[in-house]
Curated annotation (Swiss-Prot):
The active site is at H239. The gene is lpxD. SUPFAM superfamilies: Trimeric LpxA-like enzymes. It catalyses: a UDP-3-O-[(3R)-3-hydroxyacyl]-alpha-D-glucosamine + a (3R)-hydroxyacyl-[ACP] = a UDP-2-N,3-O-bis[(3R)-3-hydroxyacyl]-alpha-D-glucosamine + holo-[ACP] + H(+); UDP-3-O-[(3R)-3-hydroxytetradecanoyl]-alpha-D-glucosamine + (3R)-hydroxytetradecanoyl-[ACP] = UDP-2-N,3-O-bis[(3R)-3-hydroxytetradecanoyl]-alpha-D-glucosamine + holo-[ACP] + H(+). InterPro entries: Hexapep, Hexapep_transf_CS, LpxD, Trimer_LpxA-like_sf, UDP_GlcNAc_AcTrfase_non-rep. It comes from the Bacteria. This is UDP-3-O-(3-hydroxymyristoyl)glucosamine N-acyltransferase. Catalyzes the N-acylation of UDP-3-O-(hydroxytetradecanoyl)glucosamine using 3-hydroxytetradecanoyl-ACP as the acyl donor. Is involved in the biosynthesis of lipid A, a phosphorylated glycolipid that anchors the lipopolysaccharide to the outer membrane of the cell. Homotrimer. Keywords: Acyltransferase, Lipid A biosynthesis, Lipid biosynthesis, Lipid metabolism, Repeat, Transferase. One of its GO terms (cellular component) is membrane.
Amino acid sequence: MIEMRLSDLAQQLNAKLHGDENIIITGVASINNAQVGHITFLKDQRFLSQLSSCRASAVILSKNNLIFCKIAALVVEDPYIAYVKIARLMDTTPKPSKNIASGAIIASDAILGQRVGIGANAVIESEVILGDDVIIGPGSFVGKKTRIGTGTRLWANVTIYHEVEIGECCLIQSGAIIGSDGFGYINDHGVWIKIPHLGTVKIGNNVEIGACTTIDRGTLDDTKIENGVIIDNQCQIAHNVIIGARTAIAGGVIMAGSLTIGRDCMIGGASVINGHINICDKVTITGMGMVIKAITQPGIYSSGIPVQLNTVWWKTAALIMRISNMNKRIKTIEEKLKKLLFL
């Protein structure tokens, strides 16, 4: 358990403290479930009604909401960001070992930096280069000639194929697979012939990749993930895709091959994006968006029909199926009106 005085947390956040500065904080919790010893946060007015019954020892809030607070408080400009900073300070996620497990298999010509940790049953193949403070989780595989930069961590059972390049301070969650062959085939008189994937995957610095996400290597050119990209769980990123810096991709997104996504984009969960198109910088695609052509202007884009009662949805679907015929009828009426107007 981590314990911190409220005054120390206030100093870390540069927050104004109201109440007992000697309160000991032992954890962070939501406003509904917080107990004695916890610090919570009031994100916005929607949760104000829950503040009076909150059992936390302290709360993070904005100046405007201080008058409603009967417990110790840290007053900040943005309570949510402050909560995240405190959560990072009090994170109890186990620290990885910086030892090399006896069961790890490491090629004799692999180059390991200082303070490298390699878990049990991990495999490090020939000519791999691991920077300082790299952590390779148990059961992970790092293929031949792969390079991993300083401070990057692979959780358990991550697979990195040959000749992949991963930058500094990246975090790759369990089950991720990076550098596997893409879906590249050509049909020769009824027989599918596999296209060799001669490119690789190049990942920048400060990139986070979620559990069970797959990133395919390029066919000729490389698949590229630029600095600061964050990718959620169970995403599929096909061969030759390029993702611009600081783009955020939610869970279950599917990206077809040779797609280029700009910088500072946000892709909502379960979206599907066609290949061989470009999406410009600062584009947001809402959840379950289907993108079939290039996007050249920044903005928020949506597609699909939001959930409805089943009976209503069937009526909507029936109307959609009739749109083509309705359009033809409207055009016919317009033509008749034009003739009448010019008589």
